[in-house]
Amino acid sequence: MGACCSCLCSRNRDSKYPPLLLAENEREAISALLQYLENRSDVDFFSNGPLRALSTLVYSENIDLQRSAALAFAEITEKDVREVNRDVLEPILILLQSADSEVQRAACGALGNLAVNNENKILIVEMGGLEPLIRQMMSTNIEVQCNAVGCITNLATQDDNKTKIAKSGALIPLAKLAKSKDIRVQRNATGALLNMTHSGENRQELVNAGAVPVLVSLLSNEDADVQYYCTTALSNIAVDEMNRKKLSTTEPKLVSQLVNLMDSPSPRVQCQATLALRNLASDSGYQVEIVRAGGLPHLVQLLTCNHQPLVLAAVACIRNISIHPLNEALIIDAGFLKPLVGLLDFNDSEEIQCHAVSTLRNLAASSERNRLALLAAGAVDKCKELVLKVPLSVQSEISACFAILALADDLKPKLYESHIIDVLIPLTFSENGEVCGNSAAALANLCSRVSSEHKQYIFKNWSEPNEGIYGFLLRFLQSGSATFEHIALWTILQLLESNNTEINSLIKENESILSGIKNLSASQQQTQQSQVNNPDSSDQFDDPKVELFNLTQQILQILG
């Protein structure tokens, strides 16, 4: 508090300054304050006598006393940050109105210190603190700028304040100060802009204020903090589809700059750059552009790093990029399959496992070459090994992957040989609709067009595990769910159309399955009749039960 004490002392010893002409109440305030300062460890400066003494100096017309009060508040609040009331904030806000840069600097600093406390953040804005802070941001004094922006940055961490700040006129000067030559001002300004990107409405205000070109230009800044704030802000801005479209037309260098930052020596900059690319890759144009900009080598390297947040960011990014059909072969050729399969064992993060499986599923969507590469990389075996013991979210992704793979006739022999049916049957018992439905769909596809060469796998799994294919068909026939009944009937029809006498016998000689088919047929017939009797019934031709009835008739016709 030495600086404060010296400001309170007489300047008679310095011939450059005339003696201070003080009012009686000011002399008393100085005397009391000097006494409080001598015993500062036992004094509460935010109430009673100490606060009255400071307030007296604040309201003085003597600029030296105002400076002393501002400096005192700055130093006191640096050491004692807690919730304060209006009586404490009011004199500091008065000091903000001063035309003196020393008073402005110290008052902004004091307010910024108090703005670390959440309740104070709300009260400062409620008491009209934004307007004078915005004025001080536009000061020609760098120190005043720095403290004013720092205070705004702190205030912007409070959710209720963000919209008020966005609409206060603060964003344009913040964007301007983000280009300051003073690194402290830059950091504070970009940090404040980042704090304004956590809601869609505020992000739009930020875009309208012209902050995006500034943020993009600062991606090449040498300071890691500025890079971090800018990449994170842009990542948040890219969450919104409208903003992504605008970025694609106005910021042609954005992707290449973010790709370069994936190689930053700062892990948190790497992470945010990757997340920004992930958000951009929600759009198909960016999915292609990231690959063209050389993003794949960086991403494949990040998948095997030791920093979990980076791994998550990278696998989430490649998952989005893999959605585009043009990227599938390029991703495989870039060496992603092995690390992606390796991430399936990442038990510490369901999210990483989910993104890895989802990427593998995307890569298998459209090409026999890709599907065979997946199989050769051990993806199916690893999924089969894990699927019954992973969390539900991962299980859902794996079952969806199985459903996609089972659609491909070229892959069916390999899937049979991997004994995938051994895990599909238990998965059809899942209480989760997605897991159950995906697994049933995969099983149904594997029962379609069964060749003589592979009929052994149907026989092997007819009654095991868990009552096997037979049990699956019976449960779904009796489920009461039109979707599941449809899967069961379609599977039975596929088995019968394989034209294999032994497979047909499995169904023809099973009274439970035959009974289930006939019961459904009778039920659907009654439904059909009621619709005939009630011609005004809406959507009678779109009723899924019509399709169920048609399936039962096809099956019964084949069975004779």
Swiss-Prot record:
<dbReference type="GO" id="GO:0000407">
    <property type="term" value="C:phagophore assembly site"/>
</dbReference>
<feature type="repeat" description="ARM 8">
    <location>
        <begin position="325"/>
        <end position="365"/>
    </location>
</feature>
<feature type="repeat" description="ARM 7">
    <location>
        <begin position="284"/>
        <end position="323"/>
    </location>
</feature>
<dbReference type="GO" id="GO:0071561">
    <property type="term" value="C:nucleus-vacuole junction"/>
</dbReference>
<dbReference type="GO" id="GO:0043495">
    <property type="term" value="F:protein-membrane adaptor activity"/>
</dbReference>
<dbReference type="Pfam" id="PF00514">
    <property type="entry name" value="Arm"/>
</dbReference>
<dbReference type="InterPro" id="IPR016024">
    <property type="entry name" value="ARM-type_fold"/>
</dbReference>
<comment type="function">
    <text>Functions in both vacuole inheritance and protein targeting from the cytoplasm to vacuole.</text>
</comment>
<keyword id="KW-0519">Myristate</keyword>
<keyword id="KW-0472">Membrane</keyword>
<dbReference type="GO" id="GO:0000011">
    <property type="term" value="P:vacuole inheritance"/>
</dbReference>
<keyword id="KW-0677">Repeat</keyword>
<feature type="repeat" description="ARM 1">
    <location>
        <begin position="39"/>
        <end position="76"/>
    </location>
</feature>
<feature type="lipid moiety-binding region" description="N-myristoyl glycine">
    <location>
        <position position="2"/>
    </location>
</feature>
<feature type="repeat" description="ARM 2">
    <location>
        <begin position="77"/>
        <end position="116"/>
    </location>
</feature>
<dbReference type="GO" id="GO:0031503">
    <property type="term" value="P:protein-containing complex localization"/>
</dbReference>
<dbReference type="GO" id="GO:0051656">
    <property type="term" value="P:establishment of organelle localization"/>
</dbReference>
<dbReference type="GO" id="GO:1903044">
    <property type="term" value="P:protein localization to membrane raft"/>
</dbReference>
<dbReference type="GO" id="GO:0034517">
    <property type="term" value="P:ribophagy"/>
</dbReference>
<feature type="repeat" description="ARM 6">
    <location>
        <begin position="243"/>
        <end position="282"/>
    </location>
</feature>
<comment type="similarity">
    <text>Belongs to the beta-catenin family.</text>
</comment>
<feature type="repeat" description="ARM 9">
    <location>
        <begin position="409"/>
        <end position="448"/>
    </location>
</feature>
<dbReference type="GO" id="GO:0071255">
    <property type="term" value="P:Cvt vesicle assembly"/>
</dbReference>
<dbReference type="GO" id="GO:0031965">
    <property type="term" value="C:nuclear membrane"/>
</dbReference>
<dbReference type="InterPro" id="IPR000225">
    <property type="entry name" value="Armadillo"/>
</dbReference>
<feature type="repeat" description="ARM 3">
    <location>
        <begin position="118"/>
        <end position="157"/>
    </location>
</feature>
<dbReference type="GO" id="GO:0071562">
    <property type="term" value="P:nucleus-vacuole junction assembly"/>
</dbReference>
<dbReference type="GO" id="GO:0042144">
    <property type="term" value="P:vacuole fusion, non-autophagic"/>
</dbReference>
<dbReference type="GO" id="GO:0042802">
    <property type="term" value="F:identical protein binding"/>
</dbReference>
<dbReference type="GO" id="GO:0034497">
    <property type="term" value="P:protein localization to phagophore assembly site"/>
</dbReference>
<feature type="lipid moiety-binding region" description="S-palmitoyl cysteine">
    <location>
        <position position="5"/>
    </location>
</feature>
<feature type="repeat" description="ARM 5">
    <location>
        <begin position="200"/>
        <end position="239"/>
    </location>
</feature>
<dbReference type="GO" id="GO:0045121">
    <property type="term" value="C:membrane raft"/>
</dbReference>
<protein>
    <recommendedName>
        <fullName>Vacuolar protein 8</fullName>
    </recommendedName>
</protein>
<dbReference type="GO" id="GO:0000329">
    <property type="term" value="C:fungal-type vacuole membrane"/>
</dbReference>
<dbReference type="InterPro" id="IPR011989">
    <property type="entry name" value="ARM-like"/>
</dbReference>
<dbReference type="InterPro" id="IPR045156">
    <property type="entry name" value="Vac8"/>
</dbReference>
<keyword id="KW-0926">Vacuole</keyword>
<feature type="lipid moiety-binding region" description="S-palmitoyl cysteine">
    <location>
        <position position="4"/>
    </location>
</feature>
<feature type="repeat" description="ARM 4">
    <location>
        <begin position="159"/>
        <end position="198"/>
    </location>
</feature>
<dbReference type="GO" id="GO:0034727">
    <property type="term" value="P:piecemeal microautophagy of the nucleus"/>
</dbReference>
<keyword id="KW-0449">Lipoprotein</keyword>
